[in-house]
Amino acid sequence: MPENIEQTGLFGKYLSINKIFKDREVLRHSYRPHTLPHRKEQIDQLAAILAPSLQSETPSNILIYGKTGTGKTASVRYVGSELEAVSRKMKSYCQVIHINCDIIDTQYRVLTQIAKLLSDDNDEHPSDKARIQIPMTGLATDQIYSKMNEQFEHIGAAFIIVLDEIDKLVKKSGDDTLYTLTRINSDLTHSRVSIIGISNDLGFKTFLDPRVLSSLSEEELVFPPYNAPQLCDILEQRAEMGFNQHVLDEEVIPLCAALAAQEHGDARRALDLLRISGELADRERADKVTTDHVHKAQDKIETDSMTECIRTLPTQSKAVLFCMLILHKHGQKVFISGDITRVYRSLAPALHLDVLTSRRVSDLISELNMLGIINTRLVNRGRHGRTKEMWFDASIDRIWEGIHDDPNERFTAIPSEIVQDALTGGI
């Protein structure tokens, strides 16, 4: 607690003695625990596959699958850290290069980032660092590839390149990067490179050329979802480090685990629930974290994630959703695709958008259904044929909040008379 609490003004009451947390950082996804409960089998498999790198051999490439929060990245980082530590003791240098393809999602950026990390991260290697400066833009890809290979050869070691969220890279930029990296060893004499791809999406393999898939998936590992008892063990481990003694009601951790187990066994969701429950109790100046705090945390997470989902929708998807909101505001609780399409065609020009075809509007409606924002069903209307009925599955307030958070304010600036004209022609 600050010595002069009276000088902290607005924040004073929040900086007083913390009754709840001992170290809340251990409850975040970014924290790396020393042990990973219920992932020994996968860790042992990874170690067995990568062990040849310690004997001047090239390990197999690996594809790792599993839903969000199943310990894929944490396990790979753990094994990679152990591999580097053992290699230093054995003086058989190995380096693990971790690339987040959700951010670094083009071939140029991936190759550039690898080259940069090769230059920056070799303080402990006996050779001089290969200080080759590479701009983030401006060079041809083959030039970047050549410079990267220079650094591999300069260092002369075993390298494991981890492409986390590899599906994001493939879906945005195709499989050229993977084709290049899986064939890199034919251009190297003094170094060896292996690839680990991590994905939440089994379907991304359909985007790969068969030759790339064959090279990349020499070994495949699947990380199953955690069940509720396993999530309890994970939360108990973190809670012991993260919370003060006796502040958690005994039902809090089992409830967090049970709720997260329903979300495909997501350890990240379980940790978020536990941490946010503690934060809510802390803000209330409560002495204990209770199941009421867990339920409030669950509502908060679902609210925040849905608003963010809607806020980041493409503008045309927002426009279709906006048309549903207008219909709902004027009394319709269930919509049919024809009404939505007619209102959309009237409003799109006023929203400064190109008017999409009925088929494309229907596709966007299906995407909104997949995101859990709306529900849909096909109904038979007799001689009028079949049509799609829709209704909101998410909170109307959350949807409006996400729609209104548009950088161009197009959905708040549209004149009411234009909306009324669209409704008159659209119903």
Where are these regions (language model features)?
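AAA+ ATPase "lid" subdomain C-terminal helix
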Residues: A261-A267, R275-K288, H328-H330, A348-P349, ...
